[in-house]
């Protein structure tokens, strides 16, 4: 506020803002909106949905102290335990060694290494990208995480705050590979999933302060800004209209769709969907003007780039993410959010508005082409519902081709629905554990942000991550968001960021005794 008041623009606009605020405070519009907000709050407080979200289930309560959780945590932490014993036996030698102190200083900054790694991963252009980069990077971060616990007696790689469902999904991934109908086609996809597992375990286990959370959000916002500016530059340079991306009869006059560093406009839009809520959360929780500016500018440019992707499923997902964010943050702002949405609709370019109108138009070639995909996936699941085809879209595509189940005009690539695709790959238990894991994360996040004692930075991190995950799950109803492994990694990075915030919130309430939440 002091920065605004001391600026020339602030001195000019602040009196106008204060005058408008005073007039609005006692206006009829303000009373109507406050009444709507209060009625909404009362309705939500007693709703079945709110009770479901805020109630902690029996499995969730039992997981942390269960024998299975303890055994898995012990097995995963064996290398760290051995290093701790080595440090205890040679403590004096390590403490007196300059080289050892330098190594400890490096490995204990694992969250910073993850932040830099994710920044690089998200901004490498598609033609230079190789999925081996992310696997090698997170394998190195995992080794750093293991070594970082050498001097911390109680440090363990954390599975308790991953929850039973995500752990079960990870187990199903490992099982789905040997049980695959086409193991050779599933091998490389196993590495993609293992990369995501390493990402989640490393972030949840090593983030110990709100400053580390803020740093991860800052680097994510910076990556969002870079890729969004690349998309805007692409639009300025000119993008050729690709008929395979759009129905030219229903979208006349629509320009080419931008894709930035991700080859496909839908893929780029899905990345924006995951990162925009995180950037907004970073803006709202930053303590300095530079962080607030980065969060605001990256989110604003990201929204402009999102419009230029013309990706309808991601638009719907972003709208849903905005609703989730506002409801969790301050339900009284819902009427203002509705007004803001109406204003945005009124000023949208004609091409964007016309694109929105085609969302439920079944004559659209993109929409119409999905029905044969869904039908083929449904028929396959009738034949192999429990085990699925095996990891990866290649195995599913091969299985459906061998059974001659797809009868569309084009060829079968994937199911264009994340729930069907995960079911076809990992079987019934896999899809249940996946959906259960994301809902478990969302529920734990809702419970954490509802506590009055929750740290503001931790709270906003959870809000941004939970909103992004829910929006992406809605987007996944019409698209397979993990078609590109890099997007799958970003999805699990946001999930890990949310879980890390939940862990810090629980630690603050005394549910876990370890390092402090703040520094």
Regions found by a protein language model. Name each.
Residues 245, 360-375, 387-426, 448-452:
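Long extracytoplasmic/lumenal interhelical loops at the membrane interface
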Residues 120, 171-175, 198, 214-254, ...:
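Alpha-helical transmembrane segments of multi-pass inner-membrane proteins
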Residues 139-145, 332-333, 339, 463-519:
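Transmembrane alpha-helices of multi-pass inner-membrane enzymes
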Residues 1-175, 181-188, 208-214, 218, ...:
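Transmembrane signal-anchor hairpin modules in multi-pass inner-membrane enzymes, especially those
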Residues 229, 235-238, 326-365, 375-383, ...:
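A membrane-periplasm/extracellular boundary helix in multi-pass inner-membrane enzymes
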Residues 184-188, 265, 310-313, 412-417, ...:
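Membrane-interface catalytic loops of GT-C/OST-like multi-pass glycosylation enzymes that act
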Residues 303, 308, 374-378, 384-387, ...:
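A conserved mid-to-late transmembrane alpha helix and its immediate loop/hinge
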Residues 131-149, 190-199, 268-276, 315-323, ...:
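Membrane-embedded alpha-helical segments of multi-pass membrane proteins
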